[in-house]
From Swiss-Prot:
<dbReference type="InterPro" id="IPR016162">
    <property type="entry name" value="Ald_DH_N"/>
</dbReference>
<dbReference type="InterPro" id="IPR029510">
    <property type="entry name" value="Ald_DH_CS_GLU"/>
</dbReference>
<dbReference type="InterPro" id="IPR016163">
    <property type="entry name" value="Ald_DH_C"/>
</dbReference>
<dbReference type="InterPro" id="IPR015590">
    <property type="entry name" value="Aldehyde_DH_dom"/>
</dbReference>
<dbReference type="GO" id="GO:0043824">
    <property type="term" value="F:succinylglutamate-semialdehyde dehydrogenase activity"/>
</dbReference>
<dbReference type="GO" id="GO:0019544">
    <property type="term" value="P:arginine catabolic process to glutamate"/>
</dbReference>
<comment type="function">
    <text>Catalyzes the NAD-dependent reduction of succinylglutamate semialdehyde into succinylglutamate.</text>
</comment>
<dbReference type="InterPro" id="IPR017649">
    <property type="entry name" value="SuccinylGlu_semiald_DH_AstD"/>
</dbReference>
<feature type="active site">
    <location>
        <position position="277"/>
    </location>
</feature>
<keyword id="KW-0520">NAD</keyword>
<feature type="binding site">
    <location>
        <begin position="220"/>
        <end position="225"/>
    </location>
    <ligand>
        <name>NAD(+)</name>
    </ligand>
</feature>
<dbReference type="GO" id="GO:0019545">
    <property type="term" value="P:arginine catabolic process to succinate"/>
</dbReference>
<dbReference type="InterPro" id="IPR016161">
    <property type="entry name" value="Ald_DH/histidinol_DH"/>
</dbReference>
<keyword id="KW-0560">Oxidoreductase</keyword>
<protein>
    <recommendedName>
        <fullName>N-succinylglutamate 5-semialdehyde dehydrogenase</fullName>
        <ecNumber>1.2.1.71</ecNumber>
    </recommendedName>
</protein>
<comment type="pathway">
    <text>Amino-acid degradation; L-arginine degradation via AST pathway; L-glutamate and succinate from L-arginine: step 4/5.</text>
</comment>
<dbReference type="InterPro" id="IPR016160">
    <property type="entry name" value="Ald_DH_CS_CYS"/>
</dbReference>
């Protein structure tokens, strides 16, 4: 029984699904998808639970959410192993994900008060008040690269605001989704407040097509995000938050410490086996001898990165990709770039057949025409050389995406110029592209999102504002508008 609907674990009535460790092939989870009827059942449960959950005080809802944080802490080792085994991440990285989930609770509570709390302004004859109300029933679509942390970034603020939820994890990480749901169950969420439906495309389509849905919060690929946007077009009453990918540029200008710059680049491009939406996909490198030396060092250090299993000792920097198919897609993308005229500096290699262990790849594309503006979701870095900083900014902005952008340079003036001209929601200076502050919004423009950034701003799309003018008494104004006569004379 792998679906959680209205406070009960039930068996899915859809297609059967098996999840294996992407490196070893070990069977980790087996179950059945939710069919359309069960998706509707989850929606009815969420709708029925909404009035009571929304009427609770924030303090009462916060008690449950903080209890969940405590359960994350006490079950950290177990959840770390589940995420690592299911995604292929090394143990150390899965542990950082669980830590981020724990920290998200306090951050979301603070953000609720700052972004969507209550305000009151006194007026001569009363007061003006601002409150925020929950939307109702929200669907949360989770991704596979952070199967705990990223859905958590939607679920926690949505619950705090008083919404009820139908959560569909990625079909590639059903075990992690179920494990997190069981902790919410232990935290004491009332039946129907949070429901879990497992499944792939068919389940997702049934969920997004629900008429009684008040909103959908999505993290994933741009193509799917565009499909959801089209599906919900003409329904302005539904909130839609899309956090999608990026074809992210990292500009390496002047470098004082080559090894430090190489380390930053590897952290930007290859952490999580290149499976972060903010990962550097395009390296824009200044022409000249220093750029040549940097590139040679980057290739040399990257060549030493050997991906390993989640529990290998010593621990590897990167593990496997989410699946053998995902790893093969990266290899295919590299082969296509090479066929277009790209110059391979480091060829990506599958270490074993029927595994997702893939070494990083680096390919130079300077002067190659018609390079696709697509996100290759894996450890493949494309390199372009530039002559002037103005040219670098033009190259950085030459994408339909707009998630993250970074600059390595000792010159503050160049960063200030980039801040003015870059088209990206995250613009970093001498910091990895994959780094983001917990007290900042997270999202992009263009094909990277629909102007609904998450993280610190997630509270914004989890509630709607209600403005009020209030007075505890009613009296006739001392001065009336022209044409109003409240005298005692009888009009004949």
């Amino acid at each position: 029984m792998t679906l959680w609907i209205n406070g009960d674990w039930i068996t899915g009535q859809g297609a059967s699904r098996v999840k294996r460790n992407p490196v070893s092939g070990e069977v980790l989870w087996q179950g059945n998808d939710a069919d359309a009827a069960q998706v509707e059942q989850a929606c009815r449960a969420a709708r029925a639970a909404f009035p009571r959950w929304a009427r609770l005080s924030l303090a009462e809802r916060q008690v449950v959410v903080e209890r969940f944080a405590g359960l994350l802490e006490s079950n950290k080792a177990e959840l770390t192993a589940i995420i690592a085994r299911e995604t292929g991440k090394p143990r150390w990285e899965a542990a950082t994900e669980v830590t981020a989930m724990i920290n998200k609770i306090a951050i979301s509570i603070k953000a609720y008060h700052v972004r969507t709390g209550e305000q009151r302004s006194e007026m001569p004859d009363g007061a003006a008040s601002l409150r925020h109300r929950p939307h109702g029933v929200l669907a949360v679509f989770g991704p596979y690269n952070f199967p705990g942390h990223l859905p958590n970034g939607h679920i926690v603020p949505a619950l705090l605001a008083g919404n009820t939820i139908i959560f569909k994890p990625s079909e590639l990480t059903p075990w992690s989704g179920e494990a997190v749901m069981r902790l919410w169950q232990q935290a004491g969420l009332p039946p129907g407040v949070l429901n879990l439906v497992q499944g792939g495309r068919e389940t997702g389509q049934a969920l997004s097509a629900l008429e009684d849905l008040d909103g959908l919060l999505f993290t994933g690929r741009a193509n799917t995000g565009y499909q959801l946007h089209r599906q919900l077009s003409g329904q302005p009453e539904k909130i839609l938050a899309l956090e999608m990918g990026g074809n992210n540029p990292l500009i390496i200008d002047e470098v004082a410490d080559i090894d430090a710059a190489v380390h930053l680049t590897i952290q930007s491009a290859f952490v999580t086996a290149g499976q972060r939406c903010t990962c550097a996909r395009r390296l824009l490198l200044k022409s000249g001898a220093q750029g040549d030396a940097f590139l040679a060092r980057l290739v040399a250090v990257s060549q030493r990165l050997t991906p390993g299993n989640w529990d290998d000792e010593p621990q590897p920097f990167i593990g496997g990709l989410i699946s053998e198919q995902a790893a093969q897609q990266v290899v295919t993308a590299w082969q296509q770039l090479e066929a277009m005229g790209g110059r391979t500096l480091l060829a990506p290699r599958l270490l074993q057949s029927e595994t997702s262990l893939l070494t990083p790849g680096i390919i130079e594309m300077t002067g190659v025409a018609g390079v696709p503006d697509e996100e290759v979701f894996g450890p493949l870095l494309r390199v372009w050389r530039y002559d002037s900083f103005e040219e670098a900014i033009l190259m950085a902005n030459n994408t339909r995406f707009g998630l993250s952008c970074g600059l390595v340079s000792p010159e503050r003036e160049k960063f200030d110029q980039l801040l003015l001209e870059a088209r990206a929601g995250i613009v970093n200076w001498n910091k990895p592209l994959t780094g983001a502050a917990s007290t900042a919004p997270f999202g992009g423009i263009g094909a990277s999102g629909n102007h609904r950034p998450s993280a610190w701003y997630a509270a914004d799309y989890c509630a709607w504002p209600m403005a009020s003018l209030e007075s505890d008494s009613l009296t006739l104004p001392a001065t009336l508008n022209p044409g109003l006569d409240f005298s005692d004379e009888v009009v004949r």
